[in-house]
Regions:
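Transmembrane alpha-helix termini and helix-breaking/packing motifs in multi-pass membrane transporters
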Residues: 76-99, 224, 228-229, 339-359
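Structural signature of the two symmetry-related core transmembrane helices
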Residues: 1-15, 266-281, 362
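Short amphipathic helix-loop junctions that connect adjacent transmembrane helices
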Residues: 220-236
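Hydrophobic core of transmembrane alpha-helices in multi-pass small-molecule transporters
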Residues: 9-13, 20-43, 51, 290-304
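Loop-to-transmembrane helix entry/capping segments in MFS-fold secondary transporters
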Residues: 44, 56-68, 234-235, 319-329
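C-terminal membrane-cytosol helix-exit motif in multi-pass small-molecule transporters
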Residues: 109-130, 368-376
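Helix-to-loop junctions at the C-terminal end of transmembrane segments
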Residues: 87, 251-264, 348-349
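Juxtamembrane intracellular "pre-TM" segments in multi-pass secondary transporters
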Residues: 125-211, 228
Length: 387
């Protein structure tokens, strides 16, 4: 699946470099999972997260996700710098903007091919661990079944009474209960989660709210805002977001240390909440230098919740449900993030409204932080319970 995703990425890059048809571009962007935020989105992220969780211990999981986030942020930073610098250099040679951008997306396609090659050389240990989780779950069920069989042999009269009681209870429950049970079983089969479903669905709703707010200020929109407000050129924009992503990546390592001391939820909220206050302050800055400074300070703490969030999802669900949980929460975030750009496009066409996306994003994300703390401060991952 990861190789397939890389091939789709390469195909999308080729499509963007070779056609101007809007519908084909929309199709390529959707199937190729092109992210306007500069960060990975789509169904393949859940596979990576589940595989990582299965090959590390609970105690080291958050630290591993921190390094995972750091690697992604460094790559995003280099991409922002390379994209801005390359575009600026090509335009300096009298190349018009559109052809210069096409050269950049062709490089994106080449990287997709390289990624497919690297995935092909990936160790099978991750998939083996997922299979072990499924085997362990099956072994547990078989053990429980054998225990029930042994108890039936040893205590026939007691189990006869219990069976009679269960039969009467089922009769009283009636058709409605049977339909409800069938519906729950069907839902579990479709979603891939059973016991973790309440937690996963509640987290998904909160993550969708956070992503909806974040969709107002994704990096491409923030870059365009700097262009509209201060007339910043592509090369300078590339440098700004290079350093922003560098700071974001380095902060992930600090997040793992804070989580080890204070807990995942407290770390998520304590770092994310101040960053959203800074987000609201960005458009209030009177000069480019101050706006960039506030943005960089925000990036230095805003991504601390990413490795802790990923680790928390993997911690509070059963091992065999991790891929499904990561997929469901990831889809929720993707759906939330796809709605807000519709409003941003409208606001950016009106000079009086170009600052509003920052205010909306900051407010919604602060609301997410408060709700997350209220709902999950008592739901602790295994490594925190054992301490």
């Amino acid at each position: 699946m990861l190789i397939f995703g890389a091939v789709l990425m390469a195909g999308a890059g080729i499509a963007f470099a070779s056609t101007r048809n809007l519908w084909l571009l929309l199709l390529a962007g959707t199937i190729g999972v092109i992210s306007p935020s500069g960060h990975e989105v789509g169904p393949f992220l859940s596979i990576e997260q589940a595989a990582l969780s299965d090959v590390v211990t609970d105690r080291t999981r958050t630290e591993v996700f921190a390094w995972y986030t750091l690697a992604g942020s460094l790559a995003t930073a280099l991409g922002a710098l390379a994209g801005g610098t390359l575009t600026h250099a090509l335009r300096a040679t009298s190349m018009t903007p559109v052809p210069s951008y096409r050269m950049v997306v062709m490089l994106y396609a080449v990287l997709g091919v390289l990624l497919a090659f690297l995935f092909a050389r990936l160790s099978p240990a991750a998939e083996a661990s997922i299979l072990r989780s499924q085997s362990n779950a099956l072994a547990t069920l078989q053990h429980e079944e054998r225990s029930r069989t042994n108890n039936t042999k040893r205590k026939p009269f007691f189990l006869y009474l219990r069976a009679l009681r269960d039969f009467v209870s089922r009769r009283r429950a009636g058709t409605a209960s049977r339909r409800k049970g069938a519906f729950r079983a069907t839902l579990a089969g479709l979603s891939g989660i059973d016991r973790s479903r309440p937690v996963v669905f509640k987290l998904s709703g909160l993550f969708a709210l956070d992503a909806f707010g974040g969709g107002f200020v994704i990096q491409s929109f923030a870059a365009y805002w700097f262009y509209l407000r201060f007339g910043v050129n592509p090369g300078t924009l590339g440098a700004i977001f290079f350093w922003a992503n560098i700071f974001a990546g380095l902060s992930a390592l600090l997040a793992s240390r804070l989580a080890a001391r204070f807990g995942l939820i407290k770390t998520m909220v304590a770092t994310h909440l101040p960053s959203n206050i800074l987000l609201i302050l960005v458009p209030l800055m009177p000069t480019l230098s101050l706006a960039v400074l506030v943005l960089l300070v925000r990036f230095s703490i805003s991504q601390m919740d990413v490795p802790t969030r990923q680790s928390y999802i993997m911690a509070v669900v059963r091992p065999e449900e991790r891929s499904a949980a990561a997929g469901i929460t990831g889809v929720a975030r993707t759906i939330g993030a796809t709605i807000s750009p519709l409003f941003v496009g409208f606001m950016f066409t009106r000079p009086a409204l170009i600052n509003v996306p920052f205010f909306i994003a900051g407010t919604l994300k602060i609301l997410y932080d408060l709700l997350l703390y209220r709902e999950f401060i008592t739901v602790r991952p295994p490594e925190e319970v054992r301490e």
